[in-house]
């Protein structure tokens, strides 16, 4: 019998330790990706993360939050952030407290898409154009769109500065 997500204890519960890195343990930068398909950080951020000061880490967290929120608000509404937070805590799903409730919603869907039957019980409602979607399908679409948006951001704002730096190094 499959575990039912609305029970107080679920099999996919995680520890209550705070999240110190965006890493989700699926780093694709080791295979040459410029943007990690797991955590959506840029390759140089993955490599240098442990050397970053708090301001640098915060800048990465903020960018990831802004891009993810942009994707999430186009798919669902968080109508009760308190209920969502309570459900995350009750189910021991880790989330970054200072982030938007839309990032919290992503954590819920990422961890529970296959077992959630009623999103409203978590303080969420899908926008009309997504109400017929299965949650695993929606989760995959969100992840794909988040990756594409992050990759586009990299190409627009980060890659040109790398090219400029390389060009300047050759001139000197």
List the model feature ranges, each with a label.
Residues 72-130:
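Short flanking/linker segments adjacent to small metal-binding domains or redox-active Cys/His motifs
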Residues 31, 42, 52, 102, ...:
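Sequence-level detector for tyrosine residue identity
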Residues 55, 66, 82-86, 90, ...:
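Polar/charged alpha-helical tracts
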Residues 2-77:
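N-terminal cysteine/histidine-rich coordination modules
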Residues 1-4, 10, 95-96, 119, ...:
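Extended hydrophobic/Leu-rich segments
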Residues 115-172:
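C-terminal, charged low-complexity interaction regions
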């Amino acid at each position: 019998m499959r575990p039912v997500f609305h029970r107080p204890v679920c099999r996919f519960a995680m520890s209550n330790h705070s999240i110190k890195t965006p890493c989700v343990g699926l780093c694709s930068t080791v295979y040459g990706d410029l943007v990690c398909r797991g955590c959506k950080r840029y390759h140089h951020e993955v490599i240098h993360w442990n050397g970053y000061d708090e301001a640098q880490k915060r800048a990465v967290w903020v960018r990831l939050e802004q891009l993810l929120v942009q994707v999430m608000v186009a798919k669902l509404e968080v109508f009760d952030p308190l209920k969502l937070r309570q459900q995350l805590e009750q189910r021991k799903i880790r989330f970054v407290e200072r982030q938007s409730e839309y990032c919290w919603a992503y954590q819920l869907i990422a961890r529970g898409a296959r077992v959630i039957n009623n999103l409203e019980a978590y303080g969420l409602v899908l926008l009309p154009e997504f109400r017929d979607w299965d949650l695993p399908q929606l989760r995959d679409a969100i992840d794909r769109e988040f990756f594409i948006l992050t990759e586009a951001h990299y190409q627009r704002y980060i890659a040109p500065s790398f090219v400029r730096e390389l060009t300047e190094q050759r001139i000197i």
